[in-house]
Curated annotation (Swiss-Prot):
Gene3D superfamilies: YggU-like (3.30.1200.10). GO terms for cellular component: cytoplasm. Signal peptide: none annotated. InterPro entries: DUF167 (IPR003746), YggU-like_sf (IPR036591). This is UPF0235 protein CT_388. SMART domains: DUF167 (SM01152). Belongs to the UPF0235 family. The lineage of its organism: Bacteria, Pseudomonadati, Chlamydiota, Chlamydiia, Chlamydiales. It comes from Chlamydia trachomatis serovar D (strain ATCC VR-885 / DSM 19411 / UW-3/Cx). NCBIfam families: DUF167 family protein (TIGR00251), PRK00647.1 (NF001887).
Length: 115
């Protein structure tokens, strides 16, 4: 498992594993409200109200993603970027379709089609 997490943390693209999807998340802390902003170039941009100390912002990101995606917090695993604005999160594979549904312009750019 440690080897897999090391491999994933070096990977720059969002990749699909059997049953899982690694999503890159860009976090803005100390925001006015917790919200998912957009999906741009395969990176999900989010804002959280928490400060980046003692894991508070990371916990807020996990809670925000779980709420936005309507999945349990236990299905959202932070695998890289604990001390960074750029994080990698392991999610169930089925979530990719949901995200592309929420951000249609991203789905056309990832499939090569123009809207």
């Amino acid at each position: 498992m440690r080897f897999l997490l090391k491999l994933l943390s070096k990977e720059k693209e969002n990749i699909l594993l059997e049953g899982f999807w690694v999503l890159e998340v860009r976090v803005t802390t100390k925001a006015r409200e917790n919200r998912v902003v957009c999906l741009e170039d395969g990176i999900l941009r989010v804002r959280v109200t928490e400060v980046p100390e003692k894991g508070k912002a990371n916990d807020a990101v996990v809670a925000l993603l779980a709420n936005f995606l309507s999945i349990p917090k236990s299905d959202v695993t932070l695998i890289a970027g604990e001390a960074s604005r750029r994080k990698k999160v392991l999610l169930p594979r089925s979530i990719k379709a949901f995200l592309l549904e929420q951000f249609p312009s991203e789905s056309s750019s990832t499939t090569g089609k123009k809207s």
